[in-house]
A protein has these predicted regions:
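Short amphipathic alpha-helical segments that mediate assembly, nucleic-acid/protein binding
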Residues: 1-4, 68-72, 85-93
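Acidic, proline/glycine-rich low-complexity IDRs
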Residues: 77-111
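Intrinsically disordered, low-complexity regulatory segments enriched in Ser/Thr/Pro
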Residues: 33-80
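Negatively charged, low-complexity tracts enriched in Asp/Glu with abundant Ser/Thr
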Residues: 1-32, 105-110
């Protein structure tokens, strides 16, 4: 069984403990953005085989985009092939599985 706390640190994520004791995994990027990782309930991931949600924010904390992964191993593969905090990794994470902001939708009702 994977020790997810250790595995996130090995991938280059920082561990931040919130006031309520919840742990958030964060990776900073050079363009003043950062990515957080939670489970699909917004909590600290505890199992390798659970959905993970990545959310990217700007330096003011405004949501930019999100990606979803079915398992930690999917995320791990992308992170292992690219340097932590690199622009390349940020782009790959963004493109992996995107949850679009409303302003990015393109459809007949949203041209």
């Amino acid at each position: 069984m994977l020790d997810l706390a250790k595995e996130f640190l090995l991938l280059g994520f920082l561990e931040e403990t919130e006031e309520d004791g919840a742990v958030t995994y964060i990776m900073d990027f050079p363009d003043d953005t950062y990515v957080t990782v939670t489970d699909d309930n917004g909590r600290t991931p505890v199992r390798a085989k659970q959905n993970l949600v990545l959310a990217c924010y700007d330096k003011e904390g405004c949501y930019l985009w999100g990606s979803e992964f079915k398992t930690f191993m999917e995320l791990q593969k992308l992170c292992q092939d690219n340097p932590a905090g690199s622009p390349q990794l940020l782009q790959i994470l963004k493109s992996a599985s995107k949850t679009l902001k409303d302003s990015e939708w393109s459809s007949p009702s949203h041209p």
